[in-house]
Amino acid sequence: MKFIDEARIEVIAGDGGDGSASMRREKFVPFGGPDGGDGGRGGSVYAIADRNINTLIDYRYAKKHLARNGENGRGSDCYGKGGDDVTLRMPVGTIISDMDTGELIADLTEHDQRVMLAQGGAGGLGNLHFKSSTNRAPRQKTDGKPGERRMLKLELKVLADVGLLGMPNAGKSTFISSVSNAKPKIADYPFTTLAPNLGVVRVGPSKSFVIADIPGLIEGAAEGAGLGHQFLRHLQRTGVLLHLVDLAPFDESVDPVAEATAIVGELRKYDEALYEKPRWLVLNKLDMVPEDEREARVADFLDRFGWDGPVFEISALTGQGCEALCYAIYDYLSEHSDAHRAAEAEDLAADVRFRDAPPAKGGATPGDDA
């Protein structure tokens, strides 16, 4: 199935039914009075998170979603039937926002989470409600209210604990297939990965974490070059980033330090918050480096790269060093998961506050250019 992580849709809730202006007419009841029923409410449109769905492809082509209108009221105090609701099932991790106002409507982070996207209109009142001591035969009634109509942007950010960064052909797909149940396409040419892959890494009974592999980045990605920039958003929810570096490139003219520096630069240009995330350096393809040269090559790389954070040396192909890396990741996530969730909740709250901020004097809104 094609991976789609962004879509735009229109949701239209049903209109409420009109109230009825009817009089009771029965034999032997000369003053029957009003008996007009209310109109039914319009159907609403809901979104529900479903962990069994992993793409927004259904909404790339089905762009309009309508709920039914409520039925009109009738005589004999008959109320109109309410319109049927419409439920849209979306992947866990979907962010829903209003394209016209910029309002953040929902962030679907849990399975079966249900959110109203457009509310159906209220039904109109029948003339039964307008009867009084001075108006025994009212002819008044009210029409149903129109349902909400919204243009929405759907944006999927996969929920992963760990994100993989690196140039094309750095060995990210080989690594995720080596340590998890993911089966990405693997080949000896760049840009093999064209869409994010998720894998569950198990380090023991009831001990696991989710890792995300996105297409490789290239220099200029923040400005749109290559494929990886389209999927960097999927790393924004992760707790730690693994920066994979090919320590033994086939092309001897390629400098691993220059490539690693370019990746860090693109990360910073795309999102400062993403750049500030905990990041570990993973030096891959050690099996391609002669044993007597490994220590010197690693030391030279770290010295020229100027890295003083966590470093792991692995071979994704042979599995060397992968087990120790996975245990270190799990221990780190276990220790920092509460802080990570709190920070993510604060970021979401700040986003909501920003979007709901009142317009500034002169009609300008937050984020407008001066």
Swiss-Prot record:
OBG-type G domain location: 160-334
GO biological process, any: ribosome biogenesis
Residues noted as binding Mg(2+) in the record, renumbered to the chain: 173, 193
Primary residence: cytoplasm
Classification via InterPro entries: G_OBG, GTP-bd, GTP-bd_Obg/CgtA, GTP1-OBG_CS, GTP1_OBG_dom, GTP1_OBG_dom_sf, OBG_GTPase, P-loop_NTPase
UniProt binding sites for GTP: 166-173, 191-195, 213-216, 284-287, 315-317
CDD domains listed in its UniProt record: Obg
Membrane-spanning segments: none
Broad enzyme group: hydrolase
Nucleus in keyword set: no
GO MF annotation terms: GTP binding; GTPase activity; magnesium ion binding
SUPFAM superfamilies linked: Obg GTP-binding protein N-terminal domain, P-loop containing nucleoside triphosphate hydrolases
Keywords for the protein's UniProt record, in alphabetical order: Cytoplasm, GTP-binding, Hydrolase, Magnesium, Metal-binding, Nucleotide-binding
Record's subcellular location: Cytoplasm
Region described as Disordered: spans on this chain: 128-147
UniProt domain Obg: residue ranges: 1-159
EC number assigned by the record: 3.6.5.-
Record note on quaternary structure: Monomer.
NCBIfam families in the cross-refs: Obg_CgtA, PRK12296.1, PRK12297.1, PRK12299.1
Record PANTHER family: DEVELOPMENTALLY REGULATED GTP-BINDING PROTEIN-RELATED, MITOCHONDRIAL RIBOSOME-ASSOCIATED GTPASE 2
Family according to the record: Belongs to the TRAFAC class OBG-HflX-like GTPase superfamily. OBG GTPase family.
Name by which UniProt lists this protein: GTPase Obg
Classification lineage: Bacteria, Pseudomonadati, Pseudomonadota, Betaproteobacteria, Burkholderiales
Underlying gene: obg
